């Protein structure tokens, strides 16, 4: 599996008007400052594909990215758990995320991004419990691996697996800064697309 090209297609503000990709979709979920945009840009080898920002909570829409001329799509979900957002806005995002996850007939897997430096938040656990409850396949991806020593990476990978109730082999380590973890992610995508 290699990503040759990727492009932004559309933003959707409401789960009632989901974009029909007519292709497999992999959703990207995670808390607001976990590095979802950086992950998409790194995996797709395009630093300008998804807008990155030091301002958490920037993604407020479902953003669709077409990969390899429609072989599959990444769908970037709004980041959850951002404190500086009005309660009404958070409720709207929650409904949009839930509506997409339960309403997209093309969704094949959800990449749940976690910051390897920290224990999963209650919001992270709520997301994974939601996916378990609705029997939606997911993959845990630990971002920002460059921030820790190799030994600390292994220790924290084990901690994330334990906290989230999955085997350690189901936690993938990545660093968009050090450009590591891409091959394992490509292998995972190939598995998902079958």
Describe each region flagged by the PLM.
Residues 1-82, 194:
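Conserved G1/Walker A P-loop phosphate-binding module
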Residues 98-169:
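Conserved C-terminal guanine-recognition region of P-loop GTPase G domains, centered on the G4
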Residues 43-47, 101, 164, 189:
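Hydrophobic aliphatic residues
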Residues 58, 72, 79-81, 117-119, ...:
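Conserved nucleotide-binding/hydrolysis micro-motifs of P-loop NTPases
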Residues 3-15, 147-194:
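Canonical P-loop GTPase G-domain recognition
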